[in-house]
């Protein structure tokens, strides 16, 4: 009987250890963006804990670094852009974008006031966060859209985060960069010229959403569903309680009151409770990647997304 009891104790300890590991989720953030409001609100309000989850939220300097952490298995769920799923494909790893968070285009291209149009960027230097990141793709696409060949006709420099890129623009180290709030607001105040609002040239963009390795989505489906339930509660809380979102922006992004209020107003309208995936944006991106030769293997949008979580949570309401 003692042996049986000992075995039962060992089995229980092992089961608790496995269950505990399964309930720990590392959610990698490509950057500290106002789009992360629902995540931080859900964590602060205990919504993840209510679903039996222990969440860690490391912040990376670029989408490229976030993707590398996903590939290494250090991050289970990534909060990033549609372009990062392409990086998984390029690494010959099967990954899926499975939940839309902010389906809009917040980026604008700003330049030194002496530069009057995007065509004038020939021979100039542009800052990105890192090669392979969303800022890299959008910068190169925008240049080509206006007849400027990146690398050959305009230098692309990996500088880092949006604040770092804006600092490089202000110091004269670069001539232009794409940015999002609040640096766009600061650029306007400092007299820099907006050359392009990327909303005008790119449709239905998946600015930020969740993606993961396909094997994780398959083997930990219930964990992902519980995570998304908590995230959705966070979205509802942010929408119904503006002060909760504003306080998160002040605490984690270090915004002052005025910037936090402006950031809340700009981003809250982009949050989708149903996790809608920006299929048109994926189709657009895939076509451009194929055209540029960046993607060698043939695949479709269906190879990049997993709509089953959106469909399941929609039907279970």
Where in this protein do the model-derived segments appear?
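Short, glycine-/small- and polar/acidic-enriched structural segments
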Residues: 23-171, 175-181, 194-198, 203-204
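Boundary at the C-terminal end of the N-terminal hydrophobic targeting segment
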Residues: 19-21
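Bacterial N-terminal signal peptides
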Residues: 5-17
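N-terminal secretory signal peptides that target proteins for export/translocation
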Residues: 1-2
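Secondary-structure end/capping motifs
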Residues: 218-296
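Pocket-lining segment of extracytoplasmic ligand-binding domains
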Residues: 83-84, 161-253
């Amino acid at each position: 009987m003692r042996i049986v009891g000992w075995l039962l104790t060992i089995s229980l300890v092992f089961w608790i250890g496995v269950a505990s590991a399964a309930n720990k989720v590392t959610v990698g953030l490509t950057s500290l963006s106002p789009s992360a409001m629902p995540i931080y609100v859900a964590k602060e309000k205990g919504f993840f804990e209510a679903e039996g989850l222990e969440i860690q939220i490391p912040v990376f300097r670029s989408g490229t670094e976030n993707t590398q952490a996903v590939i290494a298995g250090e991050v289970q769920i990534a909060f990033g852009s549609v372009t990062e799923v392409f990086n998984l494909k390029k690494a010959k790893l099967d990954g899926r974008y499975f939940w839309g968070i902010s389906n809009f285009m917040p980026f604008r291209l700003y330049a030194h006031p002496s530069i009057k149009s995007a065509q004038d960027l020939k021979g100039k230097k542009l800052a990105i966060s890192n090669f392979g990141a969303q800022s890299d793709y959008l910068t190169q696409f925008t240049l080509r859209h206006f007849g400027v060949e990146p690398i050959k006709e305009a230098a692309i420099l990996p500088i880092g985060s949006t604040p770092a890129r804006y600092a490089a623009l202000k110091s004269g180290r670069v001539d232009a960069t794409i940015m999002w709030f609040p640096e766009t607001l600061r650029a306007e105040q400092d007299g820099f010229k907006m050359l392009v609002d990327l909303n005008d040239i790119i449709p239905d963009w998946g600015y930020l959403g969740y993606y993961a390795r396909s094997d994780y989505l398959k083997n930990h489906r219930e964990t992902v569903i519980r995570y998304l339930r908590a995230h959705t509660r966070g979205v509802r809380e942010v929408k119904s309680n503006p002060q909760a979102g504003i306080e998160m922006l002040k605490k984690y992004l270090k915004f002052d009151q005025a910037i936090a209020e402006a950031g809340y107003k700009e981003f809250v309208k982009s949050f989708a409770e149903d996790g809608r995936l920006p299929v048109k944006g994926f189709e657009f991106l895939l076509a451009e990647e194929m055209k540029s030769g960046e993607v060698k293997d043939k695949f479709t949008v269906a190879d990049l997304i997993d709509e089953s979580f959106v469909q399941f949570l929609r039907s279970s309401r």
